[in-house]
């Protein structure tokens, strides 16, 4: 089953969030950024309400611009430092994050007109900012 959400229309969609689901692979295919999630994703609490009985999920983001920004949360090493910051990192690291030994989990996303900001976690918080005109959820 395929669900399509358009981010280039006057009314923005409410896109479901596969919260705490592990992203296994991230690829780029003809202006589509593709997140492939773990098998048996329907066992996750956040997915049970969205799509009960789902075996797998692939999310495809159609990019308006193939450039995107990737940020990683950093906190100073100082013991008493209470504040951290997001530091921009090389966007090519995105593809390596899913294949690292630390599970890359999808946390949430923020939707705006032709824009999407995705928060993920792999040992630290990762923020991805994209220019997107449509999002497709492929459920199996």
Place the predicted regions along the sequence by residue:
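Surface-exposed, interaction-prone regions used to assemble/regulate multi-protein complexes
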Residues: 1-140
């Amino acid at each position: 089953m395929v669900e399509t959400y358009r981010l280039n229309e006057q009314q923005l969609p409410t896109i479901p969030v596969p919260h705490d689901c592990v992203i296994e692979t991230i690829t780029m295919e003809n202006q589509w950024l593709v997140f492939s999630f773990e098998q048996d994703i329907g066992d996750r609490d956040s997915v049970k309400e969205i799509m009960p009985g789902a075996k797998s999920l692939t999310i495809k983001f159609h990019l308006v611009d193939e450039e995107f920004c990737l940020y990683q949360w950093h906190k100073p090493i100082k013991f008493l430092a209470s504040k951290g910051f997001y530091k921009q990192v090389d966007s090519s690291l995105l593809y390596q994050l899913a294949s690292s030994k630390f599970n890359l989990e999808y946390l949430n996303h923020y939707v705006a007109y032709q824009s999407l900001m995705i928060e993920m976690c792999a040992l630290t918080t990762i923020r991805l900012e994209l220019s997107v005109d449509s999002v497709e959820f492929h459920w199996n």
